[in-house]
Regions:
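Hydrophobic small-molecule pocket/channel-lining residues, especially in calycin-type beta-barrels
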Residues: 19-171
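Bacterial Sec-dependent N-terminal signal peptides
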Residues: 1-22
Length: 171
């Protein structure tokens, strides 16, 4: 009897530790409103691209796979973003990488008022200017998502819109 009790205790302990942490803590689900397959439009209603958002790595990472609708300078722009909650810093973060060699790293992010807010680390924007990017995803009431990208060239005192997109469900 003692051996079987010990066996079940050890088995329960092992199974408990084997659970996936990103499935247990609801903070990892804060960005789930973005998951889906989307047609993405600019503010004028023009199709800007398509985006597929999924969870990977045992639901710890929200992956975006973006493809633009039109070629620019002979290239169909595409990229991926990897979005995750960093439990050590208690911040959401995003890493964007694209097929032009571009990348943006957002290490400060949080979910508040039905929106995911990111700020990039400062970067050299050609020459003497240091810039910062702000990226906000708004969960809209009609099942859509708004993505608003902004840039500041004066340490966040003033912001200029780089793009403003609306994600509409494909189906």
């Amino acid at each position: 009897m003692k051996k079987s009790t010990l066996f079940f205790f050890l088995l329960f302990t092992i199974v408990s530790f084997a659970q996936k942490p990103c499935e247990k803590d609801p903070i990892y689900n804060q960005f789930d409103f973005w998951i889906g397959e989307w047609k993405v439009y600019d503010l004028k209603g023009n199709l800007a691209g398509q985006s597929k958002i999924t969870k990977i790595l045992d639901n710890c990472v929200v992956l975006e796979e973006w493809t633009s609708a039109k070629e620019q300078q002979g290239l169909l722009f595409s990229g991926k973003s990897f979005n995750s909650y960093n439990s050590a810093t208690k911040q959401w973060q995003q890493n964007w990488i694209d097929n032009t060699g571009g990348s943006t790293e957002y290490l400060t992010g949080h979910f508040e008022n039905d929106a995911m807010h990111f700020i990039s680390r400062p970067f050299n924007n050609g020459g003497k200017t240091t810039s910062v990017r702000k990226l906000t995803f708004y969960k809209l009431k009609d099942g859509k998502v708004r993505q608003h990208g902004e840039i500041s060239n004066n340490e966040g005192k003033d912001w200029v819109t780089e793009y403003d997109l609306e994600y509409r469900p494909e189906n």
